[in-house]
Amino acid sequence: MRSPYGVPRNPFDPAYIPGGSSSGSAVAVAAGLASFALGTDTAGSGRVPAAFNNIVGLKPTRGLLSTRGVVPACHSLDCVSIFALSVADAAIVFDCALGFDAEDPYSRRMPAGFGAFGAVPARFSVGVPRPGQREFFGNSEAARLFEAAIARLAALGGDIVEIDFAPFSEAAALVYGGPWLAERRAAIDAAIAGRRELLHPVTRRVVAASDGLPAAEVFRGQELLATLAQETETVWRRIDMLLVPTTGTIYRIAEVEADPLALNATLGHYTNFANLLDLSAIAVPNGVQSNGLPAGVCLIAPAFHDPLLAAVGAAFQRQGGLPLGATGATLPPIEVTPAPVPYPYLPIAVVGAHLEGQKLNGELLALGARLRRAVRTAPDYRLYALADGRRPGLVRDPGAGTAIEAEIWDVPVAAIGAFLASVTPPLGLGTIALEDGSAVSGFLCEAYAVEGAREISEFGGWRAWRSSRQEGR
């Protein structure tokens, strides 16, 4: 918000702040002056302005958009962000801008099959902070709107899981209270040498906080961050994404000018940790308070989960039915083609030893796979007990088969190669038609292997067959 050109005006109430350092870009989009605009997001400047201007703020995985040419704030954490009126527009711009830049030391190559937009899974798990950990800083309307957002995500297919938010908030405190302050200073040291008086007073206070910081503190900070990141890993094993308010509240310009550092920390409560923990995020509009000011929510997930966040974020925005920015326009029926690979997971149907609780299920768990749902195949399959006695064989026989019990597991795309290597003949992966008319990749058996094998289709599945054998002993 600090600028030699003055403070951009919040189009909903000029007495209130429009956001952070990229708020000019956000205001331009909200007012309909531009279809999209770029920002930078180190600690939340690509998301907070989105919330305050009723628009979308896409903060990609670190390194997917080049930061070459960007004046750094904290180079290892900086991201180029995208503001747009809709998630679809933001995803289209993201897709155009994606690419590795050998001249940016923090640029990262995107994984094979990666695209900016994915598909909404039938079911997905959404983490939310425990009720006692939700901070709205006295804003009861923001709290009410967040509860409504939780209900809307549940209606879209989200399974709501309360999580411990403590390691995320502890990591957030490191942005302005840890050794990363020294990196901020390093970014501008040469430019301000002997001329600190040229800095804005607030910026000068932030930079001065790193004066005399011992080198050992940098390593202590890195170790603390690694510890917190490991703690959050236990959370990510339970959920696909995290839902938080983009900010807990909003302030008047006069309030921020009176106490800039403290209120800035408050506004970053739900955003400051994302880049430190290498997470992807998208801020989407959520509702309007009684005073006419918008409030937003943020969907957050591990690195390279951007397509999943865009898909769910687009569905959430459409369900909300809010006008676009401050334009008064409604969301058009834009359809974005999902990437060919359903990043970050590939659904795999299993019918035998990989079922939950069965002998080989541990292989899936070791790869980080998660059970999505129990299903049945279309009534076009036969199931056989193979000669080794450890696995069944599923063979398609259109018009002469039956529906077979199966489970769909979401396997990380990055682990598919290792999973395929573990599958031995006569089994392989093919396409399985399901009872609901959809199709999914899954285990099939070569026809030669079932010659002379016992057919167990009448049992309806591998579990029932094994139970019958144990009961018969």
Language-model region placement:
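Glycine-aromatic micro-motifs
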Residues: 314-319, 324-473
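Small-aliphatic-rich amphipathic alpha-helix that forms the alpha element of a beta-alpha
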Residues: 231-234, 262-285
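Short glycine/serine-rich loop segments
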Residues: 1-97, 275-298
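Short, surface-exposed loop/helix-turn segments at secondary-structure junctions
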Residues: 8, 107, 174-176, 180, ...
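Short, well-ordered beta-strand elements
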Residues: 82, 293-305, 309-313, 317
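A short helix-breaking turn/cap at a secondary-structure junction
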Residues: 59-144, 148, 167, 311-339
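Short helix-loop capping/hinge segments that flank enzyme active sites or metal/cofactor-binding pockets
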Residues: 120-129, 179-233, 238, 283-293
